[in-house]
């Protein structure tokens, strides 16, 4: 709920518990088998929490997900919500892109970016804003070491916001069955920046 044309009550809080519950319900309703959960950024946390709730998965792919819960992270997350409130996703993307994307991806985005006329604040009851605000309820103190399924960690080096190398190393080392892929020419949005390479690695 909250995505595109989905329906939800204006009074409903699209918090972490609801998002994870929706994921679990969708998987159970469709009776999906032999799945691999793939999550970008906080989506990887939601996927991991679904495993905690008993969802059966053959593996887990975490794309620029790993980070430690601290004042810096909370500051970043709350600021993103505030920016979206006053300038919408266009301002949020323009603000973030130079510090989360590779130079080549910035060049691709530039023609449609940095246009102040696109800066329109999100209404509080829109799905995207509710999801962003709900993301603030996420608990990043998850015990990653409890994950039993094989994990593939993808990290983009041009992500200067969420990529703290030492923190990622510490979390990755705590996991039981991990493979790591480093993308020196990508940032936070690996599936958008290098879609072919991303798909190839998933298929492998």
Regions picked out by a protein language model, each given a short descriptive name:
Residues 39, 43-44:
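Catalytic nucleophile loop
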Residues 45-52, 56-87:
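Flexible "cap/lid" loop of the alpha/beta hydrolase fold
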Residues 172-189:
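Catalytic histidine neighborhood in serine/cysteine hydrolases
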Residues 160-167:
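Conserved alpha/beta-hydrolase "acid-adjacent" motif
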Residues 186-199:
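Catalytic histidine-centered segment of alpha/beta-hydrolase-like enzymes
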Residues 1-38, 200:
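Active-site loop/oxyanion-hole signature of alpha/beta-hydrolase fold enzymes
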Residues 71-73, 89-145:
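Conserved alpha/beta-hydrolase catalytic His-Asp/Glu region
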Residues 147, 153-155, 159:
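Short beta-strand/loop motif that positions the catalytic acidic residue
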């Amino acid at each position: 709920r909250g995505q595109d044309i989905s329906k939800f009550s204006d009074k409903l809080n699209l918090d972490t518990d609801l998002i994870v519950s929706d994921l679990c319900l969708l998987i159970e309703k469709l009776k999906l088998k032999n799945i691999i959960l793939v999550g970008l950024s906080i989506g990887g946390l939601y996927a991991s929490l679904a495993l905690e709730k008993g969802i059966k998965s053959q593996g887990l792919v975490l794309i620029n997900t790993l980070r430690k819960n601290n004042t810096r992270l909370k500051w970043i997350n709350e600021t993103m919500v505030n920016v979206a409130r006053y300038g919408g996703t266009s301002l949020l993307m323009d603000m973030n892109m130079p510090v989360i994307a590779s130079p080549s991806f910035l060049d691709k985005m530039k023609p449609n970016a940095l246009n102040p006329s696109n800066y329109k604040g999100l209404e509080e009851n829109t799905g995207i804003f509710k999801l962003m605000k709900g993301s603030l309820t996420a608990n990043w103190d998850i015990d990653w070491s409890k994950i039993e399924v094989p994990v593939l960690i993808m990290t983009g080096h041009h992500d200067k916001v969420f990529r703290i190398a030492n923190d990622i190393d510490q979390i990755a080392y705590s996991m039981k069955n991990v493979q790591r892929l480093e993308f020196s020419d990508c940032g936070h949005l690996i599936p958008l920046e290098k879609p072919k390479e991303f798909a190839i690695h998933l298929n492998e």
